[in-house]
Amino acid sequence: MRTPEEMMELILQVAKEDDRIRAVTLGGSRANPDCPADVYQDFDVAFYVEDVAPFWDNPAWIAEKFGTPSLLQRPESMELIPPDRDGNYFYLMIFPDGNRIDLNVTPEHYEDDGEPMLLLLDKDGTFPKIAVAKDHWYVKKPTGKLFADCCNEFHWCLNNVAKGIARDELPYAMEMMNRPVRDMLILMLEWHVGVDWDFQVSPGKCGKYLKKYLPEPMYERLKATYSGAEYGSMWRAAFETLYLFGDAARRVAAALGFPYDEQEEKGIEEYMKLVKDGRLCPKGQGQETERKGREKTE
């Protein structure tokens, strides 16, 4: 595997030898000193050019300059995921030695959005000054409205998890659990970290550093919210998710002076228990579904 120094040398060599490329920046985790360094870090690079057209959808240029990637994605040329259509062209590349470059070929303009960024090359000496704001990565203190909305979204979406299990709709139940419900859980845990660390740390994208900042017992509980595909396992994870969220939310609410809607939590807990125990269907209706649902939780 090529070293980071070798990769940086390659990137700068390509830029220096091409007069159309006027500046180069490095972003992402490699520009952030607070991110732990490892072999999986991407090289998030931007080439600033006057005209993007010659670089647009041109994998032959990529192969000539960087070598043929083992895997290549060109988001701006895809239909499945609508592109941003902002004038930039991205090449996302993984090479045979495992190195990854996310290359953005962009028109000559730069707006400092506060994310860590390093200027690697400025041929004209006119590149705007980059004022790195490290706290851009810190967990942000929520407003009372944002906190309440997170709680409501979390509690509401749990009902879909329960329905999906009861209906034997595994993909749907998993999607609800691991998208809207988990998104809100991770957000609340990030605020919990913020409270404990005075909002001066970053839990990372998707909460990837939560293990570092959460109390160990709470992190163990978080692990228990991930289930297998058996419905019994899913029910246990769903209730653990409910209780973990509630404990974290109470901590955040107390620290920031927000009210926490205990009745809302109680309401979804009672509903989940009704569904789990098969007590919603009128007598004589849905008995077979109820029986199967109970068997799958045993």
Which positions does each model-derived feature cover?
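Conserved nucleotidyltransferase catalytic core and NTase-mimicking acidic/glycine-rich helix/loop elements
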Residues: 138-286, 290, 294, 298
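Conserved NTP/Mg2+-binding pocket subregion across the NTase superfamily
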Residues: 6, 66-178, 278-281, 298
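Short, solvent-exposed loop/turn segments at secondary-structure junctions
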Residues: 31-32, 52, 108-110, 195-196
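Short aromatic-enriched loop/helix-cap "lid" or pocket-rim segments at secondary-structure transitions
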Residues: 36-39, 115-116, 203
